[in-house]
Amino acid sequence: ADKEQADPSCRPAISGSVSDMSAYDTVFIGYPIWHGQAPRIISTFLESNDFSGKTIVPFCTSHSSGIGSSDSDLHSLTSDSAVWMNGKRFSSSSDRSEITEWVKMLNLNIQLPTTANRDVSSFDLASGKNGSAPTVMLNSGYEMPILGLGTYSLHGDTVKNSVTAALNHGVRLIDTAYMYGNEKEIGEAIRASDVPREEIFVFTKIYPGEQFENPEKAIQDALDTLDIDYIDMMLLHHPGANDVKAYLAIEKFVEQGKIRSIGLSNWYIEEIDDFIAQVNIKPALIQNEIHPYYQEKEVVEYMHNLGIVMQAWYPFGGRGHTGAMLSDKTISNIAESHGVSAAQVILRWHLQRGIVAIPGSSNPDHILENISVFDFELTDKEMEDIAALDRNEKHDWY
């Protein structure tokens, strides 16, 4: 890396890319100062994209010096019509409020999309491929993979091996909770992985009772136990006494940048409107029991209309019911016609309904199978046939 930095002509390869750069008017570019300059990979990024007419806002995270000439050295790498704003250095102690004030002072007139005009009821499934799920934009402004790994009932080396296998197979969404008792092991697996932290979206949940009564401690305990710098989304596990108090506490951690998005688990129509009226940040996601035998059509439509993403736990029906669902004749016949498994049909059905799914598994082969649902599509008739299986049959008490 030092050799690359010493060569101004060096252009390290970038493993990923920004989709549809034309959709952005303003681009923030952050980097550490390296020998008084921006890392050469920033040059690669600037030369790989068209910044014509865009506003570019540089910032750095140097611990010693200011941004200096590191940003002006980059100006020649973009078109003359690109507008460069003055850069700023942030220290390691900078918090969200300092960054927010800086952005306000820039007077950029950034128009953020609202939940009213953001459609979260369907996904761009054509952009996915086996081993790489597409993402959905949350109302918090963060992108989240639409297919992941649930870790309920997985513990010790089993959960560590499951998370490792999932990450190796391309899964980038991991769900856990305080009540699962496996946050520590999941954090260890993520830290041991070669996958960059920013590519992994991690859920956890705090539980009614003591955690809702003292939410600040519960939230900090989750951050400390996972030990992965920040939590992508924290959910309230289900309604209970002090749930508004707990949610408002999470909002404070969002302001500090330690939690990125907030959601709810096991919330329904009769509860959501009253709850939203008492908080400041609208939930980005609701995680409920949803599967072919309990389809929650009204709830899904209602939450989607609020701009809230829906996520299914128990996508295969849950404990004691998975076998029956996977052997369901309707589902099995559809699976046979596509040359895929019944589990893959069920997951594809969720995704085509605009519902994120987090199937749990400790079997690496099943984990790979579950992330491989982007090379076939269910017909309208097949979607209708599965919709007809709805029995309003809830398999858990939430």
Question: What positions do the PLM features span?
Answer:
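Short helix-capping segments at alpha-helix termini
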Residues: 49-52, 78-81, 192-199, 226-228, ...
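Beta/alpha (TIM)-barrel catalytic core signal, keyed to glycine-rich beta->alpha loops juxtaposed to Asp/Glu
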Residues: 125, 134, 238-398
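Solvent-exposed loop/turn segments at secondary-structure junctions
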Residues: 33-37, 62-66, 90-95, 154, ...
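Short catalytic-loop micro-motif centered on adjacent basic/acidic residues
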Residues: 29, 57-60, 86-87, 148, ...
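Short, acidic/polar
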Residues: 154-167, 211-227, 245, 270-274, ...
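N-terminal binding-site loop/beta-alpha segment at the start of enzyme catalytic domains
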Residues: 117-200, 317
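Active-site-proximal alpha-helix that buttresses catalytic centers in soluble enzyme cores
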Residues: 1-116, 169
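A short, structured active-site edge motif that brings together acidic residues
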Residues: 58-62, 86-92, 197-210, 232-239, ...
